[in-house]
Each structure stands twice: as C-alpha cells, then as structure tokens.
Regions:
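N-terminal helical capping/dimerization or prosegment-like subdomains
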Residues: 2-100
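Active-site metal-coordination/substrate-binding segment of hydrolases
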Residues: 82-147
Length: 147
C-alpha cells in the first residue's frame, strides 16, 4: 500500500471523528462583520490553533489589527530528512446568518441532510470556509498518523 493509499484509508476510518471536529468548529459563531461576535472569532482561532497543536504542529493565534489569524508550522519526522513544503490557506470567519427565518434549524447547529444529490452538511460556514479548512487539517492529521 502506498503512503497515499494509507492516508486515504485513514481519512475514511476517521470520518466520524473528523465530522465531530468539523461540527465543533461550525458551532462557533465566528461572524467577522459584527463586532458583537469579536470574542467568538478569537475563540475560533484558539480552537483551530489547539487542534493543529494536537496533531503536532507548532501553532499559535496571531493577533492583528482586525481579527486574529492562526499560523502553524510542522517539520518532517525526525530522521526522515527534508520533506515537501505544503501551504494551505483558509478562513474561519463566516457571514451573518440573517435572515434567521430562512434557516430550517439553527445556523450554528450543524446537521447532515439527505438531498437528491446525496448527503450534505448544513450550517453557516460548512462550505465557506470552515468545511474546506478542515479538509486540509484532517488530511494533515491522517498524513501525520500514517506517513
């Protein structure tokens, strides 16, 4: 089995735990355009930094004049030599969920729904951009476990 096959198998095996981590992130109402949610943006950045640290990255929240960002670095395994460099970018902030009456459930209470096209996750930020961001984190988590 190639390293890539092993990583993909690990991603599949860890799907339920990965979804729980994504749902925890989606529950944080990190609305960047509303000053009332500034503390939630900080909480979301701290959450991401802690998650990245849990898989071996040197990660930290960096405060800015606006909302904080998260920077993480991780080197190759000791003794493995120099590895490839990977950079990913995403954002943890979301747009306001208004109008609330358009939501069938709370915008920060993620759920999986069946559609004619298959299952999908419904929550503010699930596709822009917390879902994409967590695909990067989960891929790194799987790679670090098996490669």
């Amino acid at each position: 089995m190639s390293d890539l096959d092993a990583v993909l198998a690990r991603v599949d095996a860890d799907l339920d735990a990965s979804l729980e981590r994504l749902f925890a992130l989606l529950r944080i109402p990190s609305v960047s355009t509303d000053p009332a949610f500034a503390d939630q943006c900080v909480a979301c950045a701290d959450h991401l930094a802690a998650d990245l640290k849990s898989i071996g990255f040197d990660a930290a929240r960096r405060d800015t004049i606006g909302h904080p960002m998260v920077v993480a670095h991780g080197g190759p395994k000791p003794g493995s030599g120099a590895g490839p460099h990977v950079l990913f970018y995403g954002h943890y902030d979301v747009q306001p969920p208004d109008p609330l009456e358009k939501w069938e459930s709370g915008p920060f209470e993620p759920r999986i729904v069946e559609t004619p096209a298959g299952k999908r996750i419904v929550a503010r930020g699930s596709s822009d951009d917390k879902g994409q961001l967590m695909t990067f984190v989960e891929a790194c988590r799987a790679w670090k476990k098996v490669a």
